[in-house]
């Protein structure tokens, strides 16, 4: 903020100089009012004076004020008093001329007297010494000692009063054209001056008596000097008006600068808030990536569990082979005697009960798994709602940031408009300065040309005035150069501000674009999660229906086996009680062996089907766990195995349970045996297909591709980091 402090210091210096110039102008005007008493003797010159006042009053504003500012830099205290008393003095200017205007002019009865050379010398001495007096009063006592009082003093006093009224009337006209002027200090002192101005007519009487021939030329020179002094007075008044307007304008610019500073600070605070919000959003994105990594670790754990399940399946297949060997041994024992058949049937019943118990346990575990799956679904729903709330909050923040950017753009437009207006004012100021300089140069040339016709004393006075005018011209040029430098500095600072605002707007646009991209990604992930949830719900319903169907089929088959076991028991009891012949016994034995073979095949098919159902239940459990633990993994439950298993069961039903009580011997038994062997082969093929389904291959390929994509995204994506601090800090 060093540039702002420098600018404030320069503005303060400029205001001090303006006040000093106004004070000195007022002081000069008070001292020069005494010597304008003889303007009434020359009405043509007075009319020309007023005309030139209106013509040159607006042109000599800026340059004369700058010269007076530089010439009198040490009168700040008097400037303060002059600025405070503006209102009361302007009222005096408006009322006092009307009082004097009501009095009749006695200039028509007054006979103009000629002054002597000592009086002219006193006048020049007074003009040279009037700039050093602090109060603007003329020491007229010296003139009283030199010039005796004549009887014509009342007429002189009246002429002085009329000249003062005409001068003040001209000043009042200038004040009405530009209100707010600070140069009206001469009004309260007019009532004190008639006693002092009485010395001027006495001096004029001596001049008329001493040198009547030289008086006409001297009076012409004095009238020219009065005209020039009146022009300078008018210029001083117009310059004071301009200084007042410049003071007001500087105050307004200071207020605008304070407002702009407050706006910049507010914008910096808003920018820091937006940076904090972006950091929070990035932290949320990092949390989501960590959650994805956790899901990947859970998938790896599920893979390990799948391998363990495969190992358990292999152990169960080994147990199945052991059971098959045991079954073959039981069959051999059953051939040895009918007593062993009852024992084998009992063991089969026990195994069926064990199978029922295992089925119940599996059902209970399935229910527990279902409850866990429902809890996880509820948790996913809660997470989805939280994500939706976060998305809405991000959209709201985006709209707020967009509004702030629009407001900043409007402020930039306003600053540009103010810059254009300042440039236009500077151009106008340059044009006015050039016109004033041209008018001054013309005046200097005219004074040079007229100096050859004047006397020695008038040439010295005009040369002094020329030197002063040249000095004023040089000082005004220096002031213009200073103002140009300040203008260039302000223009560069404004360009820097515009560049900074443009860069900040671009950064805000980039941040908004990043937020929009993040919101779009979150929306897509939300839609994917919703679709995955719906698919998992459908698969869960399919699984429930499938388990219900398998339960019903197993219960019906268990009832059928119990009925067959009861029939076998009845046959065994009937065998002991019957007294049939040997042929009947042989035929019955043959039928029993065939039925035993059929029952064995049925038991084998049931055991294989039971194993397949157990494997299917385990696979469904794994799929449900994987779906609940990793909803984004995109795993799908394959229902082809269930359909194939159901088709196999439907195909086994007519073969195994059709006409079990009639025509067990003969060709029918052979055909039935062949059908059972074919059915057994088809069941084994189904088990092989269940162990190696094509859906599992697709699932494995999909999981591998998903993990590969996640790793590529995590390794290649690099979030944008802002290392710079916010502007508010």
UniProtKB/Swiss-Prot annotation:
Cytoplasmic side: 2-696
Biased composition, class Polar residues, residue ranges: 175-186, 626-638
A Gene Ontology term for the protein's cellular component: Golgi cisterna
Domain of life: Eukaryota
Main localization of the protein described in the UniProt heading: Golgi
One Pfam assignment: Golgin_A5
Intervals, Lumenal compartment: 718-729
Keyword tags: Acetylation, Coiled coil, Golgi apparatus, Membrane, Methylation, Phosphoprotein, Transmembrane, Transmembrane helix
The protein, known as: Golgin subfamily A member 5
